[in-house]
């Protein structure tokens, strides 16, 4: 998909 894998970035 277009989104890279990895932990989500906190706001």
Curated annotation (Swiss-Prot):
UniProt GO cellular component terms: extracellular region
Subcellular location(s) per record: Secreted
Positions of modified residues (Pyrrolidone carboxylic acid): 1
UniProt GO BP: regulation of blood pressure
Gene Ontology molecular function terms on file: peptidase inhibitor activity; toxin activity
Cytoplasm in keyword set: no
Tissue: Expressed by the venom gland.
Chief subcellular location: secreted
Keywords annotated in UniProt: Hypotensive agent, Metalloenzyme inhibitor, Metalloprotease inhibitor, Protease inhibitor, Pyrrolidone carboxylic acid, Secreted, Toxin
Family: Belongs to the bradykinin-potentiating peptide family.
Function recorded in the entry: This peptide both inhibits the activity of the angiotensin-converting enzyme (ACE) and enhances the action of bradykinin by inhibiting the peptidases that inactivate it. It acts as an indirect hypotensive agent.
Protein name according to UniProt: Bradykinin-potentiating peptide TmF
Organism lineage: Eukaryota, Metazoa, Chordata, Craniata, Vertebrata
């Amino acid at each position: 998909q277009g989104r890279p894998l990895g932990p989500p970035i906190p706001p």
